[in-house]
């Protein structure tokens, strides 16, 4: 009866990446520009493997499919969430994600709603958040005319701020930052604008204008989300979102804390280190190494100095 699953997870080379993820979390350096670290993933495009216990060496995908009792008998046919750390050193594409209905029909995948927490942010960094178009025709016309300055809405961001991005929301990043991301387990992205970058062979990445126009929320609607800050056993607790697909809560642990586990929890230590205690059995935990508290655990105890991001699927 496994109560916690520690994970060994893939890193993704991206044109906007760097070495900072590897440096920040003490991983071995690779001669690659890492833009995404899929900390907790059962998606076919990047599978986490179990590091401990009876399922050691198996993929999270297989364990989820074959041992649903570890995951509160979750009814989703595929593991529902994907947890990442992303590093942006150049503007990333302006993009939009479809909802479940569209993604299932055309991509055989989940749609994508996502939560992003900005960790390290260079001064002056902006995100693209929404657009100015009022109709699909106006949206298409602005794209055809490359009216990027007036079409896209930009906003300055700072460390420890967050955004919740429902499917259909146009978004992008201009500047340099590192972020933690919790999203539906989907790799479907429709690119609208990629800054006309070319790869080593002189080719530009594919754009998906027709699909983007089809799935974008027009006019843009900003979700109404507000964090709830409380104290638990002397530690600050921030519930960022509690939405349709997941909740995301941050525990800034300074000493020790007991945390209830309502079903199963996806845990990403953002910084620091500590001890995880489940029914008297102790495990070392450290920044950057993701783990899952299975539904066989009803409550867990953490001691140390550690900043922990916990997401719970719905």
Cite the ranges covered by each PLM segment:
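Transition-metal
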Residues: 1-134, 194-223, 248
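His/acidic/aromatic-lined binding-pocket segments of jelly-roll/cupin-type domains
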Residues: 83-84, 92, 114-117, 154-155, ...
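Short acidic-glycine-tyrosine-enriched beta hairpin
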Residues: 152-164, 173, 279-296
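An exposed, glycine/acidic-rich loop-and-rim segment of catalytic or binding clefts
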Residues: 145-151, 162-164, 170-221
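Short, basic/aromatic beta-hairpin or loop at an interaction surface
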Residues: 132-145, 261-271
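Ligand-binding loop in jelly-roll beta-barrel domains
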Residues: 75-78, 87-91, 110, 121-124, ...
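Acidic/His-leaning functional-site neighborhoods
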Residues: 226-283, 287
């Amino acid at each position: 009866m496994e109560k916690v699953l520690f994970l060994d997870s893939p890193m993704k080379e991206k044109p906007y990446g760097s070495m900072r993820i590897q440096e920040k979390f003490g991983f071995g350096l690779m001669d690659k520009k890492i833009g995404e670290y899929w900390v907790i993933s059962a998606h076919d495009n990047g599978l986490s493997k179990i590091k401990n216990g009876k399922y050691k060496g198996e993929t999270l995908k297989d364990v989820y499919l074959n041992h649903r009792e570890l995951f509160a008998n979750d009814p989703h046919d595929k593991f529902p969430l994907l947890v990442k750390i992303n590093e942006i050193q150049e503007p990333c594409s302006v993009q939009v994600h479809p909802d479940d209905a569209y993604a299932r029909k055309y991509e055989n995948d989940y749609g994508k709603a996502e939560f992003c927490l900005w960790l390290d942010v260079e001064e002056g960094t902006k995100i693209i958040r929404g657009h100015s178009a009022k109709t699909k025709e106006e949206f298409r016309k602005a794209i055809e005319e490359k009216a990027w300055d007036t079409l896209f809405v930009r906003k300055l961001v700072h460390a420890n701020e967050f955004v919740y991005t429902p499917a259909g929301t146009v978004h992008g990043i201009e500047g340099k930052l590192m972020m933690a991301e919790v999203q539906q387990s989907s790799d479907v992205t429709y690119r609208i604008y990629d800054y006309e970058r070319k790869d080593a062979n002189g080719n530009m990445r594919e754009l998906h204008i027709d699909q983007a126009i089809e799935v974008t929320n027009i006019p843009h609607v900003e979700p109404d989300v507000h964090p709830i800050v409380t104290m638990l056993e002397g530690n600050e607790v921030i519930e960022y979102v509690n939405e349709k697909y997941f909740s995301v809560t941050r525990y800034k642990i300074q000493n020790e804390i007991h945390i209830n586990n309502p079903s199963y929890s996806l845990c990403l230590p953002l910084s620091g280190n500590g001890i995880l205690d489940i029914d008297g059995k102790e495990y070392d935990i450290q920044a950057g190494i993701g783990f899952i508290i299975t539904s066989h655990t009803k409550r867990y105890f953490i001691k140390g100095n550690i900043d922990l991001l916990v997401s719970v699927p719905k």
